[in-house]
């Protein structure tokens, strides 16, 4: 067998001990498993280098593993006469715990969470998309600062990169495929820079008839957490402060109807663990419980909204049914985490905060798209789909009602779809002898097939 801990304490740095001068347990063990014993021990620090790890042989790796195991036995402080399964499992569990805490530090780092949140949001959208039904998803690697710089460098909007990429290359090019919507993982605040960026995006979106979906976080409301946002007593008066002058002015513009801002974020995945998301390589238990709100992985709700848009398009041919629990606004199968603080299982809801129906109505009237979680259920719902535009008030009720309809995204998606089709009809019928009635009949037949 391997040397005892008593002998290990005497040699400290060595991980292998010879029982006889001519032959060693180490050599005998390697011979039985068809490996060659190494001539010299290496420092364990070199295994922190990925390149050294990849270049090492199986003999060196196993020897290093034996070194670590013998050091664990030495640190136990008690003699070990034999190695049984319980002892080995105990030390394996200790190693798993140490690796788990190191992995926690990586997974819970804000920068890593930002990357994982983005890709898990994209994956959730891709998983819910049937690409056989005339649906395409294209990814554009672009940060919010890069887009802001793009608009600042362009002398005018029509020379910006976003305009060239979306309007010129697709909507305005024969054979191009008009883009139905832009979905972003960006969170906007009410600063002058972000409002100016939203204004520029809205101009491009209106030109190409492609609504833009973004999101807002607690920073938009000048709060630190969404719980503080939900606790604002008079949300209407909150937006009458001087900090929101630019935002309120943007809401008065015509192109603001092409911008949708969702809130709050949703749970991207369950914490890793044998009962939630097991890891096969080792026993990883992620240390996350309900109060550790910042340790959970949250994803942007814009991807959930986009998934509902895709479902509506596949079912109806356009993105109209995207709000209401029975009309396409439900977000199903959200992860539910059960945790125990010593008083029994408790539930971590899959959204950052509970939004009551009254508060949801207030947020919607202020130009946001709230996602409301259904209590004691595994789903949430978009009850409204208002754009950021503030509906105008007119002297007649009909005019005011029309203004409200014009500010709703389902109506904008409908108009955008028709605008895309009209562009194609106009282009394809250049030079033909079709009169207005034939073109009108062709358009009506197309619309009739979608209703």
Language-model regions: role of each:
Residues 2-145, 152:
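N-terminal-proximal low-complexity accessory segments that begin disordered
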Residues 60-63, 82, 89, 93-97, ...:
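Conserved structured core elements
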Residues 78-81, 85, 89, 101-108, ...:
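Short, charged/polar micro-motifs that form catalytic or ligand-binding hotspots
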Residues 98, 102, 118-125, 204, ...:
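Generic, well-ordered alpha-helical scaffold segments in large soluble proteins
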Residues 115-116, 148, 192-193, 223, ...:
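Short helix/loop capping segments that flank catalytic or ligand/cofactor-binding pockets
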Residues 117-190:
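Long, charge-patterned amphipathic interaction tracts in eukaryotic proteins
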Residues 170-350:
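Extended, regular secondary-structure scaffolds
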Residues 283-442, 447:
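Long, contiguous, structured domain-core segments that constitute the functional module of a protein
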């Amino acid at each position: 067998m391997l040397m005892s801990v008593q002998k290990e304490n005497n040699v400290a740095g060595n991980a292998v001990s010879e029982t006889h001068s001519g032959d060693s347990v180490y050599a005998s063990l390697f011979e039985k498993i068809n490996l060659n014993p190494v001539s010299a021990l290496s420092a364990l620090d070199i295994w922190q280098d990925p390149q050294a790890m990849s270049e090492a042989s199986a003999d060196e790796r196993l020897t290093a593993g034996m070194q670590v195991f013998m050091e664990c036995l030495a640190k136990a402080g008690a003699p070990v006469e034999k190695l049984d399964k319980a002892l080995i499992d105990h030390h394996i569990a200790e190693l798993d715990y140490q690796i788990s805490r190191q992995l926690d530090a990586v997974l819970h780092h804000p920068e890593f969470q930002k990357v994982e949140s983005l890709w898990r949001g994209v994956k959730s959208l891709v998983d819910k998309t049937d690409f056989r039904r005339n649906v395409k998803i294209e990814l554009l690697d672009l940060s919010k600062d890069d887009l802001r710089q793009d608009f600042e460098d362009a002398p005018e909007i029509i020379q910006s990169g976003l305009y060239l990429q979306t309007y010129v290359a697709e909507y305005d090019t024969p054979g191009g495929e008009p883009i139905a919507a832009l979905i972003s993982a960006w969170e906007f605040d009410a600063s002058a820079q972000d409002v100016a960026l939203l204004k520029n995006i809205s101009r491009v979106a209106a030109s190409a008839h492609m609504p833009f979906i973004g999101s807002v976080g607690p920073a938009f409301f000048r709060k630190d957490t969404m719980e503080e946002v939900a606790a604002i007593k008079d949300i209407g008066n909150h937006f009458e402060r001087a900090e929101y002058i630019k935002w309120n002015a943007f809401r008065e513009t015509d192109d603001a109807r092409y911008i949708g801002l969702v809130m709050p974020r949703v749970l991207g995945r369950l914490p890793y663990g044998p009962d939630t998301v097991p890891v096969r390589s080792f026993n990883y238990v992620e240390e996350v419980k309900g109060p550790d709100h910042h340790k959970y992985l949250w994803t942007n709700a814009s991807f959930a909204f986009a998934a509902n848009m895709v479902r509506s398009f596949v079912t109806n041919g356009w993105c109209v049914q995207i709000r209401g629990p029975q009309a396409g606004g439900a977000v199903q199968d959200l992860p539910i985490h059960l945790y125990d603080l010593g008083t029994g299982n408790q539930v971590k809801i899959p959204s950052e905060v509970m939004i009551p129906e009254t508060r949801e109505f207030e947020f919607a009237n202020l130009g946001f798209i709230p996602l409301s979680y259904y209590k004691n259920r595994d789903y949430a719902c978009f009850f409204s789909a208002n754009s950021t535009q503030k509906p105008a008030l007119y002297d007649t009720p009909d005019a005011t009602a029309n203004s409200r309809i014009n500010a709703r995204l389902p109506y904008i998606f409908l108009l955008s779809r028709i605008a895309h089709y009209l562009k194609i009809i106009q282009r394809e019928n250049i030079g033909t002898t079709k009169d207005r009635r034939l073109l009108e009949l062709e358009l009506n037949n197309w619309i009739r097939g979608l209703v």
